Curated annotation (Swiss-Prot):
This is Lysine--tRNA ligase. GO terms for biological process: lysyl-tRNA aminoacylation. The keyword Plastid does not apply. It comes from Methanopyrus kandleri (strain AV19 / DSM 6324 / JCM 9639 / NBRC 100938). A motif ('KMSKS' region) lies at residues 301-305. It is found in: Cytoplasm. The keyword ATP-binding applies. GO terms for cellular component: cytoplasm. It catalyses: tRNA(Lys) + L-lysine + ATP = L-lysyl-tRNA(Lys) + AMP + diphosphate.
């Protein structure tokens, strides 16, 4: 029996959750996601949204057509460190200031990152409603909930305090005012609360990121309903602390499900505290959780502040968008995912291609079918694309000389190689033709930006002499005879075996044989898989280079 895909399990849980707390399903089911706009938003941030999108897709298909997916940008949080992208262009004076009040050009720092990210998400098939947390704090309904929270806590009501004390959070910053004098939110504390009025002071020393900030000493009053101006931008007068703000959002938006990083799911973490506040203080059921593991890049955590990340746009330039969705959604959200944009990307495309072929051949089981359908950015095509391996396209792109966009002449030369090597079962038309062109362009960019040195090459125009031992010469002579044999097929696997057989006949170690071969053909000790290279370049040209080298090396 095939196991269900995790998205189907979660969609059913969400439906049962909604029915448990009401007689019938709500008019709309809300699935939330979000991120702090502390810097350039990347693929790691996208796992949150793609997970939400997967649950929403299954909900719409099976249970409820009206599903709302919201993405909240945490833009009232304080700047903790200067991102490497803006190092030298953003003053450290902005440390501790809300993202929404930091100017980058003519717009707030946070809007720049959030807008780009939402546009990228749409390109990857995730339609979300972008909600700025700053805008939430100007909404009358949300502000009323904020008033209820701060008046209970600072006014001695005791309901919220009793929950926080249970988790050892007696000294939590429940509300964080923005100082009207210095613009910082990281250096203030509440002195008194009376209805809508907040009295605060900006004082003390506060560690934030790698810096220590000192309050400016200003004492002032704020109205929870009225925005203030900081650096030319209207922003909320303050915000709730994260562990209190999160459940307040759930209540206001009616959230039924939310994915989030696994760090929030530990005992005493944000989700457990938030659930207690939602249920005990507001009387609202905590949403169905979908904790997920972080996506790493080359084994390290992605970080916009440290410049170690890859964006959705970066990925889309060098690989199909569906492949990233496939990588994120095929396994359970808590499964570790490390991105390797070198050879790991090639394997990822191979795996996706294999799934796609199984899907169209009717060989995929129900779980595999769900994975493929969730991986799609657009509608499922009517026919299976012509699956010329991405790694072969990367070799062909270099043989043909493609750089970024593919000209019609380059495309026809590439098609001729695909035909000669048996990679095309039928002549591509329409969708298939454009799909192949796109794959060639992406493969070319991958070579330029991420391919390891051994995957990059330039085939010699003319033969050149190479210093050869007797065994190496014997190997090359036997190899060229085999290649010129009428029985030789120009498919990569057959050609790879041919190289191994010639090496074995000459009594040469495979590593030494390949080193000699690459020196003859591309002038380096290493290169792409030999069989693939021979197939792409063509047996005739390879044979000419080998024979020419043998002759030149005799002199």
């Amino acid at each position: 029996m095939t196991k269900e895909h995790w998205s189907e399990v979660k969609a059913r849980e969400v439906t049962e959750h909604c029915r448990k707390h009401a007689d019938e399903l709500p008019d709309e089911i809300v699935v939330a996601s979000g991120a702090s706009t502390s810097g350039r938003l990347h693929v790691g941030n996208a796992r949150d949204v793609l997970t939400a999108d997967a649950v929403a897709r299954v909900l719409r298909e099976r249970y409820h057509e009206d599903v709302r997916v919201v993405w909240i940008s945490d833009d009232v949080d304080p700047l903790r460190r200067i991102p490497r992208d803006l190092d030298g262009r953003l003053s450290e004076d902005y440390l501790g200031v809300p993202y929404k009040a930091i100017p980058v050009g003519d717009e707030p720092y946070s809007d720049r990152w959030a807008r780009n990210f939402v546009e990228e998400l749409r390109e990857f098939g995730a339609e979300v409603e972008w909600i700025s947390s700053a805008e939430l704090y100007t909404d009358n309904g949300f502000v009323k909930l904020v008033r209820e929270v701060v008046n209970d806590y600072y006014g001695g009501g005791g309901r919220l305090a009793s929950v926080l004390e249970r988790f050892g959070l007696e000294d939590a910053r429940v509300y964080m005012p923005v100082c009207e004098e210095c613009g910082r939110i990281a250096t203030t504390r509440v002195v008194d609360v009376d209805g809508w009025r907040i009295e605060y002071v900006c004082e003390g020393r506060h560690e934030i990121g790698d810096a220590v900030l000192e309050g400016c000493g200003h004492r002032g009053e704020l109205d929870l309903r009225k925005p203030i101006e900081v650096n030319g931008f209207e922003i909320p007068p303050g915000k709730l602390g994260w562990k209190i703000e999160w459940p307040t959002r759930w209540v206001y938006l009616g959230v039924a499900c939310e994915p989030f990083g696994k760090d929030h799911y530990v005992a005493g973490g944000s989700y457990e505290v938030g659930s207690a506040i939602a249920e005990e203080f507001f009387g609202f059921p905590a949403p169905v959780p979908v904790p997920y593991e972080w996506i790493t890049l080359d084994g390290k955590a992605m970080s916009s502040s440290k410049g170690h990340y890859v964006t959705l746009s970066d990925w889309g330039e060098v690989c199909h968008r569906e492949v990233l969705r496939y990588l994120v959604l095929r396994g359970k959200p808590l499964k570790h995912l490390d991105l390797d944009l070198r050879f790991g990307l090639l394997q990822a495309v191979d795996d996706y291609d294999e799934l796609e072929k199984r899907y169209f051949a009717g060989e995929a089981d129900e779980r595999e079918r769900r994975i493929y359908e969730l991986s799609r950015v657009d509608e499922i095509p009517e026919e299976c694309p012509p699956h010329v391996p991405f790694r072969f396209c990367a070799v062909v792109a270099q043989v043909v000389g493609i750089e970024d966009d593919v000209s019609e002449e380059e495309f026809e030369r590439a098609l001729e190689i695909f035909r000669r090597t048996g990679h095309l079962e039928a002549e591509p038309e329409g969708f298939g033709r454009e799909w192949l062109r796109e794959r060639l362009e992406k493969a070319s960019r991958w070579v330029d930006r991420y391919a390891p040195e051994e995957a990059r090459f330039r085939v010699r125009e003319e033969p050149e002499p190479v210093e050869l031992s007797d065994k190496e010469r014997e190997f090359l002579e036997d190899l060229v005879r085999r290649l010129e044999s009428e029985t030789t097929k120009e498919d990569p696997e057959t050609l790879q075996r041919t190289v191994f057989e010639a090496a074995r006949t000459a009594g040469l170690r495979p590593a030494d044989a390949f080193r000699v071969f690459y020196n003859v053909v591309v002038g380096k000790d290493r290169g792409p898989r030999a069989g693939t290279l021979i197939a792409a370049v063509g047996v005739d040209r390879i044979s000419r280079l080998i024979r020419g080298c043998l002759e030149a090396s005799e002199d």
